[in-house]
Structures are given as C-alpha cells and as structure tokens.
C-alpha cells in the first residue's frame, strides 16, 4: 500500500531502548513517525470522550464522570496494547455497544446502569476465558485467507462510509424512497467544512507531505474555529470525577432478565466484541503489512488478551465495553507500525482527562476526510480475492458489502462465514471446512436468529 511517509526512513533511534523494545527499525519506522501516527489516531477517535457520555447519560450515568472514566480506561488500555502486544491499535469505549447498554439494557430491559455494566463485565470475562484457552486465536487462524482479506476491505468501506456520514455528506434517504440513505447536497456549514478538509487531505497526501493526515485534521479544525462552526470551550481545564468507577452489579442480571434471556444477551454482546476485534485486528495488520503471507498475525494472542480486558475494564469502570478501534487505521496510514503508536494515543488520552472539553474543538467534520482516505487505502486488499471463483468470491463479497450497509462489522463477518460453509457443503466439499468454522457458523446462525428466539422466550 502507499503510505504518507517513506517507510525506509531511518529510525533515528539506532540502538536506543525504544527502537529495540518496539522493533522500530525492523518495521521500517521511527520514533517521529510513531508519535505522528499516535497523534493522528488520537485526533480521529477523541470524539469518544464527549460522545460516550452523551449516550450513557441517557441511562442515568453522570456525564462528567463518564467522560473522565472514558479517557482514563482508554488511556490505560492503549498503553497496555502498545507495551504488551506491540501493535499500532488503539482502544476506547465501543460505539454501538454503549448504545445497546443505554437504550437496550437500561431503558428497554429495565436493568439499572450498574446491572447493565454487570452484563458487560460478564461477557468480557467469557471472552477473556476464550482467549486464555487459545480459542480466539485458533478461530482467527482458521479463517480462510480470502475472508481475512474481505474483512480488511469491508472495514475499509465501513470506515469510508463513516467518514461520509460524519461529514454530513450522506444521511437518511426519503422514507418513501427505494433506499434508506441518500447523498446530501452540501447546504450546511458542516458539509462544506468536510469538503474543505477533504480537499486539504487529498492535496497533502498526493504531495506525500509527512504528517499529511494530522496536519489536515488540525487545519480543518482551525478553519472550523475561525468560521464559528466550533467554539473554544470555557473552561477547558476540569477537575475530573471518577464516580462511575466500580459501579457494576453482577448479582441481579440473571434474576431481572431471567436465565435464558440473560444468557442470550451476554452471548450477543460477547459475539459482537469477539468478532469486531478479529475483524479490526485482521484489517489493521494487513494494512500495516504486519500479517504473514497466509494472513496469520504474529503475536496475535497478546493482542487479543489485551483487547479482551477492554470489556471487563470498561464495564467495571462504568463506561461500557472498550474495544480495538478501526480508526487505528488512520495512524497506520500515517506510518504507524508498532505499539509505540498506541502508547502515544494512550498518553494523550490520559492527559485529556483534565482537558475533556477540548475534544469538542475537533469536530467530526475535521476527521471525516481522513476516514474517507483511510477507507481508500484499505481497499487495496481486494486485489488478493479471486472473484472468478464463486466459492471464494461470493462469501467475500457478502463480507465486504454488509459491513457498511448494516453499519456492523459482526454482521458482515457472520454472513461471509455462514455462506462460506454453506457453499462448501452444497459442492460436496464439507471436509475442506475447518472444524472451528463449523462452530463459528453455528454461533452466527444463533446470533442472526436471536430475534426469533427472544420472541419464543417472551411468548
């Protein structure tokens, strides 16, 4: 793939401790590049500091405490990911899961906020157990190479789609029309800011300017301040509150929901966490050229271990499940190749604990152009998929398309896995299917049929 920097650049740190620990020279990167990549990733995902509280406060949680807790947990997990796994993957509270916690578990199912966080802790413990016995890594290694590449492409299109949505260029279509989304003609200040940012991003990237992505974000954010789209917060320094730490309850989950309903709920959250991370890790490793030729990821066990702590830590801190972020691809596009990138992101999150209001001066319209470009960069993996082979091409296509169309990574992965197994069976090649692929396909059938199961339980 094409990077914004020359990856043959000298590490500039020779035999230093950082170079040796993070294998910078071996991976064709440098301290400066990693720091720049870390800043880029942080800027692209800093929105979670104010978005997570806005969602969880609906469920009755204290917004200021959630903001501080979000930055704290994300910071610690990012540092841990960098030091333990040495991958340029950042972690923070997962969007989607936090919405399911607030609107699903609390407002719909009637759990207390502490009880909802208890569900997150329980599903995190299940995932942690699966990592401990090696099942999560074994499943990753059992996935066919074509589907691994399809996952990377699908995540790229998902990121690109997020960029268009965040930038205000794509939105809800005519409710009476044939499609649920539509192009929004730039008739707002936000949309024009996105287009301006995209122009800046394209020019800087095409000219191979070092730091193109982080420069683009900062310039676009500055333009937003100048034209009055955003305002400088007052105050911008706050005394953090950590009132949500330890606010989780494991005791009443099964009694309030019933055993079967609680088990299905935990299973659903677990499956989402489990395969979202597999998808993100696969896509980022491929983009960073850290995966082997057969698609396996060296040292993935350590990566999965740290990620599996995210749900437990997020639930225990009362800020919802933390997971590996697909926005890490922005830092990789900036040249990040090691865990030092993640450490930089973590340090910035920890600093942000005292400056949480400042996150709002970098609007989504400033980061949307970078996401659009990153989506393009990840699309190159599609060249490794043989669409002339129906067995390989059709499941791959489902995986690629359903991620952005459903706005869910797990749905795309599940559809591709189930279709892969189905086609092998109908062609008399069932013996070619890895045993774990059978298990995963069955799990996804249960996942897709969960609505029917819930109706049967409530009937």
List the model feature ranges, each with a label.
Residues 16-52, 73, 94-103, 107-152, ...:
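Helix-loop-helix junctions within the multi-pass membrane cores of secondary transporters/permeases
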Residues 109-226, 230, 343-459:
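Membrane-embedded alpha-helical modules
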């Amino acid at each position: 793939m094409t990077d914004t920097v020359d990856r043959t650049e000298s590490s500039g740190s020779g035999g230093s401790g950082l170079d040796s620990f993070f294998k910078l020279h071996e991976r064709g990167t440098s301290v400066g590049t990693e720091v720049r990549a870390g800043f880029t990733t942080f800027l692209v995902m800093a929105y979670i500091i104010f978005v997570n509280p806005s969602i969880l406060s609906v469920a009755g949680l204290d917004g200021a405490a959630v903001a501080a807790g979000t930055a704290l947990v994300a910071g610690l997990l990012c540092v841990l990911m960098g030091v333990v796994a040495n991958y340029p993957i950042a972690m923070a509270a997962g969007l989607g899961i936090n919405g399911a916690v607030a609107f699903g578990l609390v407002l719909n199912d009637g759990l207390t906020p502490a009880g909802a966080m208890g569900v997150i802790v329980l599903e995190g413990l299940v995932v942690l157990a699966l990592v401990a016995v090696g099942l999560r890594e074994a499943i990753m290694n059992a996935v066919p190479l074509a589907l691994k590449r399809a996952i990377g492409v699908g995540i790229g299109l998902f990121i690109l789609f997020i960029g268009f949505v965040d930038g205000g260029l794509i939105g809800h279509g005519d409710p009476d029309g044939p499609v649920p989304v539509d192009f929004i003609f730039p008739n707002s200040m936000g949309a024009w800011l996105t287009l301006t940012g995209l122009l800046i991003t394209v020019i800087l990237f095409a000219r191979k300017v070092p730091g193109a992505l982080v420069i683009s974000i900062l310039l676009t954010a500055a333009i937003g301040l100048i034209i009055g789209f955003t305002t400088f917060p007052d105050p911008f320094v706050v005394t953090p509150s950590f009132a949500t730490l330890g606010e989780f309850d494991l005791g009443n989950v099964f009694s309030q929901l019933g055993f079967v309903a609680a088990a299905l709920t935990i299973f659903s959250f677990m499956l989402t966490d489990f395969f979202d991370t597999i998808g993100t890790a696969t896509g980022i490793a491929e983009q960073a050229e850290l995966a082997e030729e057969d698609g396996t990821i060296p040292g993935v066990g350590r990566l999965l271990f740290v990620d599996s702590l995210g749900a437990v830590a997020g639930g225990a801190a009362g800020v919802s499940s933390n997971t590996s972020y697909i926005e890490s691809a922005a830092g990789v596009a900036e040249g990040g190749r090691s865990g030092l990138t993640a450490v930089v992101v973590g340090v910035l999150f920890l600093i942000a604990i005292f400056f949480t209001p400042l996150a709002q001066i970098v609007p989504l319209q400033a980061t949307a152009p970078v996401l659009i470009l990153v989506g393009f960069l990840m699309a190159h993996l599609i060249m490794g998929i043989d669409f002339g082979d129906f067995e390989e091409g059709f499941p791959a296509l489902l995986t690629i398309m359903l991620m952005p169309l459903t706005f869910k990574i797990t749905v795309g992965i599940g559809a591709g896995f189930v279709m892969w197994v189905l086609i092998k069976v109908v062609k008399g090649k069932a013996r070619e299917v890895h045993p774990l692929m059978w298990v995963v396909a069955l799990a996804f059938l249960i996942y897709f049929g969960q609505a029917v199961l819930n109706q049967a339980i409530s009937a």
